[in-house]
């Protein structure tokens, strides 16, 4: 099965409306860069989320995951409120492309949090997955993750002066040197640990 990435943006009159929407107003699953997270208030709230799928079927059902890290190559950020960037689950309709309704497929359990203030630009930034995040990795299929702001995860309304942005390279950028990646360390039934890297 193939995998993909995409970003989704929506606008609402208030915070609860915009994060509770079923479908995004716009989406992009073909750009070389995309909004990983985005929250901003003008006269209405604007929120973006992103989805990343990785084909991890080569791990195999008999193996055990010990460590896992998702890394994204950041290209731009803006920080006002100092929110976190959170890895969550996702469950898009397709494993090969986006629909607007995928906006609401992201979960509300954080698998990894990194402060937006600490994100480095023009560099990979690592999100080490906790036990729930590792459990979300498919041993025989496609592993489905996404990104939200910390306040989007907890449904906590930011101050109207808040503005948080993070943009990163997507799989469609030229080459693989900046691709989103999932690095998994797993144990074979009888052999030593093995590291494998997947690019989406």
Place the predicted regions along the sequence by residue.
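Surface-exposed acidic, glycine-flexible loop patches that form ligand/cofactor-binding
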Residues: 57-64, 133-139
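Extracellular beta-strand ligand-recognition surfaces/modules
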Residues: 137-160
């Amino acid at each position: 099965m193939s995998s993909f990435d995409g970003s989704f943006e929506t606008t609402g009159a208030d915070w609860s409306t915009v994060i509770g929407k079923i479908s995004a107003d716009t989406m992009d699953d073909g750009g070389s860069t995309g909004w990983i997270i985005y929250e901003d208030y003008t006269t209405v709230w604007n929120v973006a989320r992103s989805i990343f799928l990785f084909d991890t079927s080569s791990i195999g059902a008999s193996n055990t995951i010990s460590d896992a890290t998702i890394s994204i190559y950041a290209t731009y950020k803006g920080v006002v409120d100092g929110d976190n960037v959170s890895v969550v689950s996702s469950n898009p309709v397709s494993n090969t492309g986006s629909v607007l309704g995928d906006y609401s497929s992201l979960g509300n359990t954080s698998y990894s949090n990194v402060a937006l203030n600490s994100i480095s630009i023009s560099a990979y930034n690592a999100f080490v997955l906790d036990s729930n995040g590792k459990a979300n990795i498919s041993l025989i299929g496609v592993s489905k993750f996404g990104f939200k702001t910390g306040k989007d995860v907890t449904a906590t309304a930011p101050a109207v002066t808040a503005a948080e942005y993070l943009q990163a390279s997507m799989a469609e950028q030229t080459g693989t040197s900046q691709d989103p990646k999932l690095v998994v360390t797993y144990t074979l039934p009888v052999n030593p640990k093995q590291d494998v890297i997947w690019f989406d």
